[in-house]
Amino acid sequence: MRPFALSAAVFAATALSQNKGEKTKCADGLYMIAVRGTGEDKGSGRIGEIAEDVSKRVNGSIVSPLDYPATLQDPDYFDSEEAGVKALSAALDGYHSSCPNGKIAVFGYSQGGQVATDVFCGGSDNKPLTMSLVKDSVVAVIAFGDPSHVANLTYDRGTSKNDGIFERPSNETKLCEDNYSDIIRSYCDTGDVYCDVGKNNETHGSYFEKYGKEVVDFVVERYEKALKDESTSTQTSTAAATATAETSGSATASDAPSATTAAPGNAAAGLVPGLVLAMIPLALAVSEYL
């Protein structure tokens, strides 16, 4: 990966300054970031249509297009992709800070797929997101036709057996395989010019129709699982806290002295009058023989 060039840095700074001061709206459902592919018009692109399909099944969801160049030239691909990485990292950090209980899904196509995987796995001179943020908030990461695709990973889907034109190094794939294989799905089919180094130009645009429904089902399933796990965790924590409080209360009660129990000194003193009374009949009986 090339060093971050001035043009991309300026773009990223401009995008961030535009968003600075804007109040983030927290989604009642999923907050989905769509990262369009190279050459697509500004907006969420074709990958955004998949996100919109998810929103139809998850009420209260928001689809947010990532603002980045998505260009091949001016700025060139590498600068554009790095600007996307910076912008996506900032968007995820910002949403998590504003909506700590919110759930996020990321969708990336082509160059956008590389942007997404760079953010989570590391790449483009970028440190990956903190693991705690991902575990807390991110339920799914979808990539279609990622040029940095590496074949035969646990989160790969599709028919490709080859690495992409910008093959990702093993240390980055290991990070994602070890920690995020349950939330990432990277689709690449045989023949794709960019993710499979193939010769079929049509393959690169075929994922939407071919895998769209599968992706929607996966994202919805991951979202529902996250909510269920969160609910179970909350119930377990509440039950544990209640049990601790009850145990503490019982221990306090058992440790307190009984109101009906006399102090040792008083009990001994109470025996003296009783003994004296018991001795009177005996003394009278003895006196008769004297």
Question: Where are the model-predicted features located?
Answer:
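Classical eukaryotic N-terminal signal peptides for Sec-dependent ER targeting/secretion
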Residues: M1-A9, L271-G274
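N-terminal signal peptide
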Residues: V10-D28, A285-L290
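Gly/Ala-rich beta-loop-alpha elbow adjacent to hydrolase catalytic centers
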Residues: G108-G112, A116
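Active-site nucleophile loop of the alpha/beta-hydrolase fold
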Residues: V138-H149
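C-terminal low-complexity, Ser/Thr- and acidic/Pro-rich disordered "stalk" regions positioned immediately N-terminal
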Residues: K225-G265
